[in-house]
Amino acid sequence: MNYVNIVEKSKNFIELELVNDDHSLSNLIKEVLLSKKGVILASYGVEHPVLDPDTGRYISNPTIMLKTDEKTDAEKVLKEALKDIVDLCNKTLKEL
């Protein structure tokens, strides 16, 4: 089963669905995307969540939407943002 599904993709727009997640990762990705040059819109939406009986967490399938200007490739910006998040996690692990 995929954790990430591509809902829609073009040069300047990408929409992803994160399967069985909540606000945490979606909000982090959105915030990092908004700091990137060429980003016009970075947003996410979460339908009404349900309680996962196995974890006790409220989960849904949030969608992340990214729109960039004509000169900026949306997939490239998304990959840069995800790399920044991984780098931040690695830096935090080293400092612990």
Curated annotation (Swiss-Prot):
Entry-linked Pfam families: RNA_pol_L_2
InterPro entries tied to this protein: RBP11-like, RBP11-like_dimer, RNA_pol_Rpb11_13-16kDa_CS, Rpo11-like
Signal peptide start-end: none
Entry's localization field: Cytoplasm
Database matches in CDD domains: RNAP_L
UniProt GO MF annotations: DNA binding; DNA-directed RNA polymerase activity; protein dimerization activity
Protein function: DNA-dependent RNA polymerase (RNAP) catalyzes the transcription of DNA into RNA using the four ribonucleoside triphosphates as substrates.
HAMAP family: RNApol_arch_Rpo11
Name this polypeptide is given: DNA-directed RNA polymerase subunit Rpo11
Organism: Methanococcus maripaludis (strain C5 / ATCC BAA-1333)
Gene: rpo11
